């Protein structure tokens, strides 16, 4: 359903094949949550004990769970332009993005109190962050995707620098 909706909005590349929970279990080589398990406890246990083998469908070169900076920016635009999405959907998406806990990319060098709603992406050798900086002149859309990284830390640092430069240019 989500891929049909994305295609209807004109997204030619963006595809989603699983939710975050499914991807985590896939990463750990587990197809699903065991019946009767507490999902949070099971995810915590898997993350602490599972070997880091990157062969699941999240890493397959099949065009699944992919997007482009252009399409991600178009999606962000839908969140800031009133009337493009139902208000309830827009408000809920922005609320989730404002609570993003990964802070080592776009927000890293922003001054305290600067509002940012963003979504990160990470797999070995790839770092992404796409977000909306809410600045006095108006919202600024920022999308940074880096790949083929020898150092994931260097990729995160580059995106953090982009966040700083965008803030300086538009604040």
Residue ranges and their predicted role:
Residues 57, 61-171:
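Structured C-terminal helix/loop/strand segments within mature extracytoplasmic catalytic/sensor domains
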Residues 1-76:
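Mid-domain, small-residue-enriched loop/turn segments at the edges of structured enzyme/sensor domains
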